[in-house]
């Protein structure tokens, strides 16, 4: 996860390789790169930002980046964001999934050319699809950078805030597998 106070999707990152291994031939077809926790300082303190108080999901070089104390003075001025930037440059992903949580409801959001993946995820999970332009702005976000700036499909899985992480994984396992296996 990117936000330290959003643990709902973390089990999915640990369980996905095992789930894929149970599908014949899946591991031979897929290269999977998993980051369980991009924000260990925030996770340890159960806060949104990192140790510098910066929201790492607003610190990417998207065209809509806005400097500020909570977002960073410039894109990638936080070591965690810089590390992910370097990883993306090295791995050149064909699809990115990121887990967050939202108060009061769950949904899947997408940026870039990811509509078919969002529809597939929604079909298998029952999560409604929320378009980015119908949500509050997220300047400098991972979705803005990966999806809009780089043109790589990205799904943001917004789990219900406070939900049980194991239940969240079990509820979305088949949807995540369907998306990953279709990429």
Where do the protein language model's features map onto the residues?
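Active-site/substrate-binding loop(s) of hydrolase catalytic cores
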Residues: 2-134
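Active-site-adjacent mobile loop/cap segments within catalytic or ligand-binding domains
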Residues: 106-108, 136-183
């Amino acid at each position: 996860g990117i936000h330290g106070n959003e643990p709902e999707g973390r089990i999915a990152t640990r369980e996905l390789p095992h789930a894929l291994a149970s599908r014949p031939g899946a591991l031979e077809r897929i290269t999977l790169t998993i980051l369980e926790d991009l924000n260990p300082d925030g996770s340890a303190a159960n806060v949104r930002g990192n140790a510098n108080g910066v929201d790492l999901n607003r610190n990417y070089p998207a065209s809509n980046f806005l400097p500020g104390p909570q977002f960073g003075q410039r894109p990638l001025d936080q070591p965690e964001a810089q590390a992910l930037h370097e990883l993306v440059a090295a791995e050149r992903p064909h699809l990115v999934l990121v887990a967050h949580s939202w108060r009061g409801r769950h949904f899947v959001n997408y940026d870039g050319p990811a509509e078919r993946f969002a529809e597939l995820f929604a079909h298998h999970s029952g999560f409604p699809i929320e378009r980015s332009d119908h949500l509050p702005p997220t300047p400098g976000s991972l979705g803005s950078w990966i999806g809009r700036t780089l043109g790589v499909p990205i799904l943001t899985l917004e789990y219900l805030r406070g939900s049980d992480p194991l239940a969240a994984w079990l509820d979305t396992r088949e949807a995540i597998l369907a998306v990953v296996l279709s990429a």
